[in-house]
Amino acid sequence: MKLRSTFQDHAIDFWLARGAIALIAGLQLMFFNERLIFGSKWLVPTIELVMLVPLSVATGWTQGQARHAEDDGHWHIIYRSRRLIRYFSLLLTAFVSLLNMIALISVTRELLGGAKGGQTLLIDALNIWFTNIIIFALWYWNMDRGGPARLGLHEDTRPDFLFPQMIGNGDKNPAWSPGFVDYFYVSFTNATAFSPTDTMPLSAQSKLLMTIEASISLLTVGIVAARAVNVLT
């Protein structure tokens, strides 16, 4: 029963994750130039939102089923549904990650090619940097302890991240579990410090993801610094 109450406690995290994708689509629509992503500036955000709609509907259906679940059979159906939702969510996150990487490569090429329009390049780079934070928050949330599909339905035995709240007087605190906001904070601090801060990666995959995020962030900040120096000189 304690595990299933954890599912209810973190129900809002699924909607925060869906909202994060919608925010990325909005940022792309408002700030990305058509030269950075293929096709019309409406194409990519539209694809993302079209993929987001069935994902949101499935999330709402699953949470509705969880509120009325009465036996293990119901929870088994919910678990299977959440696994399918997680796979589709990972696909959408990978798609957004690829597009952000393409945009970063395009901005880097323009900077190295001496492109004009310093203000535009700065806005593009900052947008890529912030989008990267959201993307990796989604990756961390989807990866830790087998992802949200297992949350509240299976015992968490091998976490991928060690949060400060998990340690109390040297002992693991089982009453606390991380939510999407916690993973967003981890992503933000990793992108600004270029290394872990108060939350440590434990698994190889978490270390690899944090390394990739820090590298992308370092390159993006380098673009901003290079453009600033160019403007000043």
Over which residues does each language-model region extend?
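Short, hydrophobic transmembrane alpha-helix segments
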Residues: 29-41
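Hydrophobic alpha-helical transmembrane segments of multi-pass integral membrane proteins
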Residues: 18-28, 48-55, 89-106, 127, ...
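Alpha-helical transmembrane segments and their membrane-interface junctions
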Residues: 28-29, 96-115, 180-198
